[in-house]
């Protein structure tokens, strides 16, 4: 039902993985999603699972949705007998190579790409639905992203390095030690880190 796929080498610094959630489900099945520091674009290739909670967008078939960095878990519930979704999960800081808005604006947000001009659009989602195979869908995504890399939104190398150090220490690295390792003042780092990752 849930399967993960690795990106091509050129995109692996930015994309954690592609994932597919497809299959028959029982109506009313809940799935818990834990915060992982990443953000996702979700393409509804067919029927979808819905976000639980108030003020959540209804995920309609053949559309694109953006899920910003999460600080708390969220839940999906199935309202159909089957689901088919394809996701692109970006590494922390990975999305900033493709677009400019600070990710802090999207923390804990789930937004229809129809309401957002960030990267993908609903028309792109429709072209994915027309592809015959998953491999063709991933090829379309990768071609689009590689083309967008030419826009060359530069990422401050200190921030991905800091994320790497935080992950390596499993989140136990003291902030002062991290500041020493990346040679930046704490206030400046916090501002950049929030913009690039959506987290404080």
Language-model features, listed with the residues they occupy:
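DNA major-groove recognition helix of helix-turn-helix
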Residues: 193
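Alpha-helical bundle regulatory/interaction domains
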Residues: 1-170, 174-176, 181-186, 196, ...
């Amino acid at each position: 039902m849930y399967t993960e796929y690795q990106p091509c080498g050129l995109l692996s610094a930015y994309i954690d993985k592609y994932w597919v959630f497809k299959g028959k489900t029982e109506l009313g099945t809940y799935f818990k999603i834990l915060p992982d520091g990443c953000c996702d674009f979700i393409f509804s290739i067919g029927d979808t699972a819905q976000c639980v909670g108030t003020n959540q967008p209804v995920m309609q078939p053949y559309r694109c949705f953006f899920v910003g960095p999460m600080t708390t878990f969220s839940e999906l519930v199935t309202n159909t007998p089957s689901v088919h979704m394809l996701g692109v999960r970006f590494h922390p800081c990975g999305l900033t190579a493709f677009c400019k808005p600070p990710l802090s604006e999207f923390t804990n947000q789930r937004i229809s790409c129809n309401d957002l001009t960030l990267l993908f659009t609903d028309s792109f989602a429709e072209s994915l639905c027309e592809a015959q195979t998953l491999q063709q869908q991933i090829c379309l995504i990768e071609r689009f992203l590689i083309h967008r890399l030419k826009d060359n939104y530069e990422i401050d190398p200190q921030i991905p390095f800091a994320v790497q150090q935080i992950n390596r220490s499993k989140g136990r690295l003291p902030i002062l030690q991290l500041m020493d390792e990346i040679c930046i003042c704490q206030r400046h780092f916090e501002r950049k880190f929030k913009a690039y990752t959506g987290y404080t």
